[in-house]
Amino acid sequence: MSKRKVLITGASGYIASLMLPTLRDHFDLTLTDISEIDRDGNKVEGVNIANFIDPDRSKYEHLFENISGVIHLAFKPHTPRGAKTENAPIDRFDNEHENIQMANNIYRCAYDAGVSRLAIASSNHAADWYEHSLIHERKMDLVRPTDFPVSDNFYGWAKAAYELLAWPYACGIFGRKLETVMLRIGFTRPIIVTDYLSDSPMTEQTSSGIAEFKRNLGAYISPRDITQLFSRAIEAPNIENEHGIPFVIAYGCSDNTRRFWSLETGRKYLDYQPKDDTEIIYADEIRDLLTGDGTVIRGGKVGI
């Protein structure tokens, strides 16, 4: 039996590096990125160079020919790699607008080429206002994919826009339904205790290193779980909702004891069955940082 033909954008990026060892065996891949060199300076074999922000789709639309599914991971970071300072959050709109333009170019090329399924790397930040303002204050226990997508930053706004932008393609208004799965990916990096000590700058989502540690225990997705999630997003036989629209938004985290995102849609439509739980994987780290001698840390999920 022949392998399903799948195109991956952002193939030289970090998330792709977690999945490629397995996906190379599972699918017949076409890899694309703006560079064939990864963050560590290593060459990623088989990468086709393409800039999907370019409005001239004729430069890369051939890459979508005879493709069954697209995994879209590519994005333009708000601050160039190697820059000494980051752009201020209020100055990141133009960059994120380009990411939305890129997403539409991907959708349009896929639609025109007859691609049947998209698996898009959205982000938990598409609805991160709930986390920052309610979850952390323990006024809300779980964010669901059906909650109205509101973000307190332009990155999350762009990811929510990805999701809304795909709906016209999915609903069939242009002539056919382009099946689409939006995956709101969580925290993909290894959790290293020293990153969360008092003198650490690791406070991107919270006010302290300890709070960030607890947050990432809930948000983490392991390499094998994220690989399973994207594979199921491409292969799930039927993703139509109750209205007959093949469109799914699903959170991407492992089955963590401390998670604060619902996995209901991933389980229902994709048969996503995560294998890992940070409470087990990082049991020693949790014991050392949260329950060791002299600690006075409130238990449970992230929150005050």
Placement of each model-derived feature along the sequence:
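N-terminal Rossmann NAD(P)H-binding glycine-rich loop of SDR-like oxidoreductase domains
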Residues: 6-26
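Active-site Tyr-X1-5-Lys
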Residues: 141, 150-180
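Flexible, glycine-rich beta-alpha linker
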Residues: 126-128, 154, 171-201
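Glycine-rich NAD(P)-binding loop of the Rossmann-fold in SDR/ketoreductase-type enzymes
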Residues: 90, 94-105, 113, 157-158, ...
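Conserved Rossmann-fold NAD(P)-dependent oxidoreductase catalytic core, especially the SDR/UDP-sugar
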Residues: 105-152
